[in-house]
């Protein structure tokens, strides 16, 4: 990768879904691209970056950035998910985190439906606050989730969140307001 090291594939070609890559981050070219993106007002997305890449973006930018389709590592230990420290840093900067519906990032194979999405959302809310919450389903890139198969199922997710006690104001932020704010 010319820009930076992804979170699952190391520069030597090896893969690790369990050990975060804390050493390999943005390349020299990647730093230049991120700088130019900031100058142009473009959004930087850290969802596929290594842990080191995330911190390279955080430490070398001043504007909000996002994780368009990522979850909480404290809920499901997967290198694609964000640590609590990452969630805090991204949210303090004014960024958003779109919860991913990919079963691998949500939890165990038999527990990766709406309840798992809610667990990740609750953790993100607890650590990063209501202004970082967003949906990043990844419907166009995942093999499927038995309970959330497409946009038609968002009503089911909203109903489940309401049943779990989520207030309409926070649901509005999650479903559209935070993303609108971020991109304005």
For each predicted feature, which ranges?
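Mid-to-C-terminal alpha-helical segments outside catalytic/metal-binding sites
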Residues: 149-184
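Glycine-rich anion/phosphate-binding loops
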Residues: 114-116
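Short, internal active-site loops enriched in acidic
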Residues: 50, 139-141, 180
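Short, solvent-exposed loop/turn segments at secondary-structure boundaries
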Residues: 77-79, 109-112, 145-148
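Extended, charged catalytic domains and RNA/DNA-binding interfaces, predominantly
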Residues: 1-104, 118-125, 132, 153-156, ...
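Short acidic/histidine-rich active-site segments
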Residues: 100-101, 128-151
